[in-house]
Structures are given as structure tokens and as C-alpha cells.
Amino acid sequence: MPRAAGVPSAIRRPICAPPPSSARRRHSVGASRSAGGGASMSFRGADFMNDSFTPVHVDDPMPHRKVIRSWITPFGQRVIARSIVLLVVDYLLLFAAFAGALLAPSSIVKIVCGMAAGFVTGRLFIIGHDACHQSLTPNHRLNRWLGRIAFLPSLTPYSLWEVGHNVVHHGYTNLKGFDFVWAPHTPDEFAALSPTRRFLDRLYRSGWAPGLYYLVEIWWLRMYFPTKTYLGASRPVFRRDCLLVTGFAAIWIGAVVWIAAATHQSALLLVVTGVVVPFLFWCSMFGFVVYVHHTDPRISWHANRTEWSRTAPFVSTTLHLTFPFGIGALMHHIMEHTAHHVDMSIPLYGLKDAQAKLEAMLPGRIVVQRFSWRWYFDTARRCKLYDIERKCWTDYLGRPTSDAHLRADAPMADQRPIDAPRDA
């Protein structure tokens, strides 16, 4: 029997990972057999790596992304009617929250309703985010329209988000010099910053100001009429989308002022409760979301593209944050984030099952964290700077606050955060 043509490239061992002892033993057994036996072993290895029911042991090599994606393909069915219903329901919730923010007799109730409007704005943004990935419906043209509609309350220009998020963030997650979202400075970079930028970095990473980070560093500098410093080459569609959200904001503010006059209320108060509070709550909500998606002492950043690509970044750079009381579902399952990075075509209503499948198939590989404020502020305390040379997080004094990642493909189970002294 001729020797098999070989195992498909999608299931070959990454070059950075030496075969574990068990694999070496299997190889030695296969080598002692005839050529036909060797072919049989090769095919069995291929079948094992492509098997969507047998979990991959933590010491085995990470399967190719194509293999991993094949496990969750069944959860990628997109339904137009379901997606439109989600959008309509969230807009109805938004109108109800705005009604409370503008018409409730109590100022406190107005503020609470304004915060609720900010939360629903976040839900609508997640729908738009799916549309921007072309994962909301199977119709690309419809996705572009629905995405722009869903992005209006958050004042997000669709085309600019598409480039910054889909191309840059998803294409180069946690790769220094490419991915800019919550990218940590190295100790040398931080030392070279101006006093103002050092102050801002400390404020952003204090745990108390994720909304300020999103408002300034993402929305203002990179989304809303960005300059060439942050945008590079411009396209007419960028300006059109910026004008679209600007027009929506003008109509929104004008309607609030008109309602204030019609109901004999303070225009300033209603602008605060019906415009400022919802927008700031939305910025805080999503600044928090994008921070916790990729920041944890067990998650690395990389400066070398080759090294980065060997770490299976679509799995190793993301965190699945779980919540009680169905909060994850209220956020349209955006926290099932590993599944989203493995396959961006999975719609939001398929992410929960897709994430569960990945965690069943890759035990010990995925960072899963139950949310608590203790964990959040401990992460904020540890994850100030990232030392590329030592491959660990540090505080602002350069003291390590996480284990060094000694192996590029080390399982998450071996990468435990360590205690570190608090900042002075």
C-alpha cells in the first residue's frame, strides 16, 4: 500500500510546539510498523484532529483554525426575520427609555431612564456590529443598511468601524503596532510619553474610566471625522457615514429641545438626561466590554508577527466573561468572545452554543472568567504595561504582575496570574 499523501496542512503540528511525550510514544509505535501501518496511523491522526466530538487534550498541538471553525459552523445559520425582529424590539425599548428620560416627572427617574437608553444603545450597537461582520443576515446589502440603522444611536460611522474593527482589530488581535484597541504600552514606551499622556494612561487603566478611553481614543480620535494621523488614507464613504451620524445627532438634540419647549421643561435638563447621559453610559459600557475582552494577566500581547501567529491568537488573546442573572444574554452574548474571534460569521444568537462547543473541544485552552468586581479591579491593578521582552504584564514601576509566557503555545491552564505588590 503506498504511503498516504500526508495529513492536510490544516492539521499539521505548529512548528513552535514540540510533540508531547504521548505523541512521541505514538510515533515510535507507528514507526516500528510496516509502511501500510504508518499510513493507517496518519489517517487516524487526521481523523482525530478533524473529529468534532473528541476534545483536544491540552498537551496536544492546537488544531488549525479551519478545523476549529468547522466545529462551530452548524451555529452560523443567519435568519433575516429574526435579525429584523431583534432590531425592531431594541428600537422600541430605546424609545421607551427615551420617553422616561424626557417625560418622567422625577429628575432621578429621568437619569435612570437615560442610563437604560444608553444600555439599549449598546444592544443596538451589538446588532450593528454583527451586520458589519456580515453575520446578521445572509444578505450583504441588507446588512449594510441594518448596520447603519443600528449604529445611529451610538453615533458610530459604519464604514470607519468596519475598517478599524473588522480589518485591524480582528486581523491583528493583540499584535503591537497593528491592533490599537486597549493596546498597552511597554515600559520604555510609557517612559517616553509626555506627562499628559502618562496621566491619561494611568486614568484609563485605573478601572474607573473605560468610558473616557472609548470616548477619546476610539470614538473621537478614530471614528468621528478622524484626522490623517489616525486614519491614513481617506475614502468618500467615511465622510458620508460621519455626516450621517452627525445629522442623526442634530435631529436627536433638536427633538429633545422641542419636547422641552412643548412640555415646559428645562431644555438643559432634558439634553443632559436624554442625550448626554445615554451617550456617556454607552461609551462606558462599551469601553468596559472591549477592555475585558482582551485584558487579563493570562492574556499576552506580541510584537513579533511570526511569534504572534504561532499562538493561535483567535483563541489565546480573548476572554470569555460570564455573568449571573442572564446579563450575558441581555448583552446579546457579546461576551462569548472566543467563538466570535474564531468565526466572525456566527450571528449573535449562535454565539452561546458556539462558545460552549469550543470550550468542550479545547479544555484548558480558553480563558473563562466569572465576572466579579474583585476580578475586574485586580485585573486593572495588574495590567498596566506589557513587557514584550519578559512576556509579562507589569505595574507602572516595571514589577511583573503575571507569569511570563515561556511557551508560545502553552495552555491557559499553565498561565496563572501571580500576586504582585500594589502600586504605591
Where are these regions (language model features)?
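Conserved beta-strand-loop-alpha-helix hinge in the C-terminal portion
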Residues: 5-31
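Cytosolic juxtamembrane amphipathic/interface segments immediately preceding
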Residues: 69-78, 231, 354
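Polar-ligand-bearing catalytic/cofactor-coordination segments
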Residues: 53, 71-73, 297-301, 353, ...
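C-terminal regulatory/interaction regions
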Residues: 383-424
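Short, charged cytosolic
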Residues: 42-67, 209-222
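Membrane-embedded catalytic scaffold of the fatty acid hydroxylase/desaturase
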Residues: 121-128, 132-242, 298-384, 388
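Short, Lys/Arg-enriched N-terminal segments with co-localized hydrophobic residues
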Residues: 29, 33-47
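Alpha-helical bilayer-embedded segments of polytopic membrane proteins, i.e.
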Residues: 77-124, 154-156, 201-218, 234-289
